[in-house]
């Protein structure tokens, strides 16, 4: 059960994250433990995606961002990359009607121009179908990298300066943020990483500046609503400072 009975219902909105981002790690190791190829683990991970989406929708989380394919993943074996691309198409084809039925809005962030025309078409059609939905905002980060995101923002600002539509002294943190992916959504409150690793892996470098982190040894295909609930409960107990401090007389250990 999320939180305890000590919390009044009207306090829940301030304790629960509005935006959760997940680094879905461990598919390959999950498959290896079962004597299978990595592709088997990636396919098994779809069930965990369903669980994460369902949990988020049920608990009124506004945005869920899933790290599906990083810009560095192109360095994996060609057969695995090809399998991932086909799995992406399969997932879109099999899940989009359900997402639409449940009022979930889909967005894909990243440099999708490197994908095949077939995959790009599936992405555009899926995003268009759900564009007017008003429930959970589901973001899939595909061919995405945090550094790439910052660079593309800077490039757009540089073009404005070149076009004489922006003065250099007018560049602010807010302006840079406006050109970043997810800028129109709540800031990321909680980052969950499965698989036991404790690193960011070039994910949402700008957007997670004040996020809380939750690491679990659970491999992604085994991620379910109970694991998600544990992360949310841990988040609710955190003292978020956003770069500030707390009073010296506060009853804390730091």
Curated annotation (Swiss-Prot):
GO terms for cellular component: cytosol. It comes from the Bacteria. The keyword Cell wall biogenesis/degradation applies. Substrate binds at residues 26-30, 38, 42, 70-72, 74, 76, 193, 199-201. Its EC number is 2.5.1.31. Keywords: Cell shape, Cell wall biogenesis/degradation, Magnesium, Metal-binding, Peptidoglycan synthesis, Transferase. The active site is at 25, 73 (proton acceptor). The keyword Magnesium applies. It catalyses: 8 isopentenyl diphosphate + (2E,6E)-farnesyl diphosphate = di-trans,octa-cis-undecaprenyl diphosphate + 8 diphosphate. Binds 2 magnesium ions per subunit. Transmembrane segments: none annotated. InterPro entries: UPP_synth-like, UPP_synth-like_CS, UPP_synth-like_sf. Mg(2+) binds at residues 25, 198, 212. One of its GO terms (biological process) is regulation of cell shape. Its cofactor is Mg(2+). CDD domains: Cis_IPPS (cd00475). Pfam families: Prenyltransf. SUPFAM superfamilies: Undecaprenyl diphosphate synthase. GO terms for molecular function: ditrans,polycis-undecaprenyl-diphosphate synthase [(2E,6E)-farnesyl-diphosphate specific] activity; magnesium ion binding. Catalyzes the sequential condensation of isopentenyl diphosphate (IPP) with (2E,6E)-farnesyl diphosphate (E,E-FPP) to yield (2Z,6Z,10Z,14Z,18Z,22Z,26Z,30Z,34E,38E)-undecaprenyl diphosphate (di-trans,octa-cis-UPP). UPP is the precursor of glycosyl carrier lipid in the biosynthesis of bacterial cell wall polysaccharide components such as peptidoglycan and lipopolysaccharide. Belongs to the UPP synthase family. This is Ditrans,polycis-undecaprenyl-diphosphate synthase ((2E,6E)-farnesyl-diphosphate specific). It comes from Photorhabdus laumondii subsp. laumondii (strain DSM 15139 / CIP 105565 / TT01) (Photorhabdus luminescens subsp. laumondii). The lineage of its organism: Bacteria, Pseudomonadati, Pseudomonadota, Gammaproteobacteria, Enterobacterales. The gene is uppS.
